[in-house]
Amino acid sequence: MANPKNTESLAELKNRFADIDSVFVTEYRGLTVAQITELRRALGSDVQYSVAKNTLIKLAAKEAGIEGLDDILTGPTAVAFIKGEAVDAAKAMKKFASENKAFVIKGGYMDGNALSAAQVDAIAELDNRETTLAKLAGAMKGNLAKAAGLFNAPASQVARLGAALQEKKEA
């Protein structure tokens, strides 16, 4: 007979896997409760950071259609369930890992693909969505100004040529 606590935990994990955009898997061995609380605060409201049994995580992930996590689900494991922007969560986790050597990012899952620890680290190096859109808008604005200058240039050149011809004719 299944343990009721495990059954409840499995149902909760299934719900979390069904309602997320990406997942990062970490090892929390050696961290204090205060440090884990600090990490949860740094991750923000779009991320649920949970400690769970590897077996339950594997079962819930499999039922949610998420594959490729089995290799990294060893040892004491905590999972960051991310709804929305994964870049901000990756940045927060990378910063936390640099300040707390006991914290290890094992990998994750995003857009139908399993991620290695190096890939999660690479995600942390990306700009978030707002920054990328701001850069794109700035680049477009600059290019539009250049284009307007190019379109106006022939007209002004014709006007200068006309003025020069008129001066030459008068002389």
UniProtKB/Swiss-Prot annotation:
It comes from the Bacteria. Keywords: Ribonucleoprotein, Ribosomal protein, RNA-binding, rRNA-binding. GO terms for biological process: translation. SUPFAM superfamilies: Ribosomal protein L10-like. GO terms for cellular component: large ribosomal subunit. CDD domains: Ribosomal_L10 (cd05797). InterPro entries: Ribosomal_uL10 (IPR001790), Ribosomal_uL10-like_sf (IPR043141), Ribosomal_uL10_bac (IPR022973), Ribosomal_uL10_bac_type (IPR047865), Ribosomal_uL10_CS_bac (IPR002363). Disulfide bonds: none annotated. GO terms for molecular function: large ribosomal subunit rRNA binding; structural constituent of ribosome. Forms part of the ribosomal stalk, playing a central role in the interaction of the ribosome with GTP-bound translation factors. PANTHER family: 39S RIBOSOMAL PROTEIN L10, MITOCHONDRIAL. Part of the ribosomal stalk of the 50S ribosomal subunit. The N-terminus interacts with L11 and the large rRNA to form the base of the stalk. The C-terminus forms an elongated spine to which L12 dimers bind in a sequential fashion forming a multimeric L10(L12)X complex. Belongs to the universal ribosomal protein uL10 family. This is Large ribosomal subunit protein uL10. It comes from Corynebacterium diphtheriae (strain ATCC 700971 / NCTC 13129 / Biotype gravis). The gene is rplJ.
